[in-house]
């Protein structure tokens, strides 16, 4: 598609789409071709959705719940749906450049795919008549030198404003942001009440995936109150409404609590024992810390801070990598999580446990293929853990296979690690003069970089190279740095297993988002709320003797090629060897300390190395085991007591993905 373009033209096209424009011509061509194919697929999806919506005569989402727009009248509180049924169809008929011009004329960002620009236009406030302007007026209405053209070229920047415990919604008008804050009242029996509510509702059958925000506002000078509402499709701006001003706090609270009850069928005062109702919104519990983790600069140490820190340069670089909230947000967005509706810094443990609980119930019915119940439970999961699916049909995202269940389970696990990380990174008691060093101290680990020529470094490099499985051919790996690591208190807990037989040095990989939590808290076993069917050999901590098996769990990509893995000394003792899945494997037979999921290929045991302190390093080249014909290609080792684990090394690696 793009091979005929010159390099500068390729770069321009990629930059116009907000994509990475680095690399040589073949890389640029592949990247642009992939973007164009994606745009074409998205355009087809938008076109189909617009046709379906026009045929049905109803809204895709929002306050209408699918009602015919022609029959709907303006609500008393101003919460009406879009006025024109044909907006989506009109926008779909416009060219990409015309859509960009229209977006700029409304002060909106004009980058991204055609579908993204259309969604932005559909969800942003349009002209006073609610319709789409004539495309010719947009494309040709301004002369080249017109000041309005320059104004249109300025992309509108939306900022978050925080006063007190809660952040003002980003779409509240600027003049209100400057003079109001979220109402916070202290009561003798209840303590602080923060009048800020974010709610979600996903109904797969009705193609609903929508949010509702309510904030009671108090003027900074006191004496004036308002209530702000915003609602719409998850991932879109939606519509909003300001109620007031009210002269008394009680009026604003009455309006806020009335709206909350109307949307959820729950009383605000009883929200801690919230009950979910069909076709009603579910309240998303927020954790109001003392600092805003999304905007506080200290959570993402910069390059300048690395230069100023007392940390050794290699350690500083690694800590900066794993303690980066922006990275965490980006990685979660890539797997579908919507951090705008439930910011990572506001995650509460109860939300994580609710996510696990719904997945557990899905696991109980997934084998029965009960489509109706799976739709209902999937909607419940996406309500608790918000996802941005754009305007795609929700039926495409039903959690109806063990693979999909496993993917969502891994997402909730990552959110659990991020919940720990954000609490860690928000701590105000740390050294503000050297925040990177403060982050390091909070991990409660001692890191020592290994030198390239050292014996330990060479051993680990050999272990890595030899145990890259022949089925894992889509990437190679470069070692960026290897650290010797000691977690505070871990050796003492491990001591009772230090002389146990069969101690091995094994791999453990995980998402980049998870490492601040893992290093500070140690490797942990899934909570009771998690479904056992998500774990092949029961709930435990899983390890591998093949590097690439663990490396796959880093979920690196072209966009983020960094990965982190652990090498742990694991006291396996006598193992319970299994060829196939057993979700109750954690109930070990008497005398067994661990489970081994037996693979068809494993490192040649004759080539293993034994360290001076008696730890087996299975660094031999892979060898097929014809007699072992279970369901696994490679071995897995599982322990059900975290005291059997001692972290020994941390590896920072870079993935090189092969051309397809």
Swiss-Prot record:
Gene3D superfamilies referenced in this protein's UniProt entry, alphabetically: 3.90.228.10, Poly(ADP-ribose) polymerase, regulatory domain (1.20.142.10), SAP domain (1.10.720.30), WGR domain (2.20.140.10)
Sequence motif: Nuclear localization signal, positions: 69-75
EC number, UniProt record: 2.4.2.30, 2.4.2.-
Major localization class: nucleus
Keywords: ADP-ribosylation, DNA-binding, Glycosyltransferase, NAD, Nucleotidyltransferase, Nucleus, Repeat, Transferase
One GO cellular component term: nucleolus
Residue ranges of domain SAP in the record: 2-36, 91-125
Domain PARP alpha-helical: 308-426
Localisation: Nucleus
Domain PARP catalytic: 434-660
Reaction equations catalysed: NAD(+) + (ADP-D-ribosyl)n-acceptor = nicotinamide + (ADP-D-ribosyl)n+1-acceptor + H(+); L-aspartyl-[protein] + NAD(+) = 4-O-(ADP-D-ribosyl)-L-aspartyl-[protein] + nicotinamide; L-glutamyl-[protein] + NAD(+) = 5-O-(ADP-D-ribosyl)-L-glutamyl-[protein] + nicotinamide
Disordered as annotated region, ranges: 40-92
Family per record: Belongs to the ARTD/PARP family.
Name of the protein this chain belongs to: Poly [ADP-ribose] polymerase 2-A
Organism: Oryza sativa subsp. japonica (Rice)
Gene name, Swiss-Prot/TrEMBL: PARP2-A
């Amino acid at each position: 598609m793009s091979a005929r373009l010159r390099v500068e033209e390729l770069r321009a096209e990629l930059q116009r789409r907000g994509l990475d424009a680095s690399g040589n011509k073949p890389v640029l061509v592949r990247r642009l071709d992939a973007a164009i194919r994606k745009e074409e697929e998205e355009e087809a999806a938008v076109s189909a959705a617009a046709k379906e919506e026009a045929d049905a005569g109803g809204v895709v989402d929002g306050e209408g719940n699918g009602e015919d727009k022609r029959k709907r009248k303006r609500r008393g509180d101003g919460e009406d749906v879009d006025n024109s049924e044909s907006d989506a169809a009109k926008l779909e008929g416009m060219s990409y450049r015309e859509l960009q011009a229209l977006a700029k004329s409304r002060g909106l960002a004009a980058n991204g795919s055609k579908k993204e620009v259309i969604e932005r236009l559909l969800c942003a406030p349009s002209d006073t008549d609610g319709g789409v302007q004539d495309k010719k007026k947009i494309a040709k209405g301004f002369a080249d030198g017109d000041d309005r053209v320059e104004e249109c070229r300025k992309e509108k920047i939306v900022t978050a404003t925080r006063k007190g415990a809660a952040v003002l919604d980003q779409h509240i008008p600027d003049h209100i942001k400057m003079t109001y804050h979220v109402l916070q009242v202290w009561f003798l029996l209840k303590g602080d009440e923060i009048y800020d509510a974010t709610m979600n509702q996903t109904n797969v059958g009705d193609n609903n995936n929508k949010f509702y925000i309510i904030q009671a506002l108090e003027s900074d000078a006191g004496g004036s109150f308002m209530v702000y509402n915003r609602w719409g499709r998850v991932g879109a701006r939606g519509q909003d409404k300001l109620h007031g001003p009210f002269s008394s706090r009680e009026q604003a609270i009455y309006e806020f609590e009335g709206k909350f009850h109307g949307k959820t069928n729950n009383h605000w005062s009883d929200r801690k024992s919230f009950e979910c109702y069909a076709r009603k919104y579910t309240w998303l519990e927020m954790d109001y810390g003392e600092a805003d983790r999304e905007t506080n600069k200290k959570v993402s140490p910069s390059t300048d801070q690395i230069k100023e820190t007392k940390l050794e340069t290699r350690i500083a670089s690694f800590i900066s990598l794993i303690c980066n909230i922006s990275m965490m947000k980006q990685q979660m967005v890539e797997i579908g999580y919507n951090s705008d509706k439930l910011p990572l810094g506001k995650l509460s443990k109860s939300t994580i446990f609710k996510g696990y609980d719904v997945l557990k119930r899905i696991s109980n019915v997934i084998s029965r293929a009960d489509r109706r119940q799976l739709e209902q439970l999937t909607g419940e999961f996406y309500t608790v853990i918000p996802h941005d699916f754009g305007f795609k049909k929700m039926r495409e995202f039903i959690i109806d296979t063990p693979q999909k269940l496993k993917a969502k389970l891994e997402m909730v696990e990552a959110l659990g690690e991020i919940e720990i990380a954000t609490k860690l990174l928000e701590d105000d008691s740390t050294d503000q003069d050297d925040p990177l060093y403060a982050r390091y101290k909070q991990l409660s680990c001692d890191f020592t970089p290994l030198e390239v020529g050292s014996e330990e470094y060479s051993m680990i490099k050999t272990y890595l190279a030899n145990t890259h499985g022949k089925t894992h051919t889509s990437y190679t790996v470069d070692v960026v740095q290897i650290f010797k690591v000691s977690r505070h208190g871990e050796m003492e807990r491990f001591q009772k297993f230090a002389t146990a037989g069969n101690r091995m040095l094994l791999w453990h990989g995980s998402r980049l988002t998870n490492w601040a939590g893992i290093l500070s808290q140690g490797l942990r076993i899934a909570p009771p709320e998690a479904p056992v069917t998500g774990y092949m050999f029961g709930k435990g901590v899983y390890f591998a003797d093949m590097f690439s098996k663990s490396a796959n769990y880093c979920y690196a990509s072209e966009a983020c090629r960094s990965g982190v893995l652990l090498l742990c000394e694991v006291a396996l003792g006598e193992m319970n060897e299994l060829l196939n899945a057993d979700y109750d494997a954690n109930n070990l037979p008497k005398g067994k300390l661990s489970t081994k999921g037996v693979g068809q290929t494993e490192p040649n045991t004759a080539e293993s190395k034994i360290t001076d302190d008696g730890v087996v390093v299975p660094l031999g080249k892979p060898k097929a085991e014809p007699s072992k014909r279970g369901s696994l290609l490679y071995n897995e080792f599982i322990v059900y007591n975290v005291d059997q684990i001692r972290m020994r090394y941390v590896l920072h690696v870079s993935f090189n993905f092969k051309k397809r």
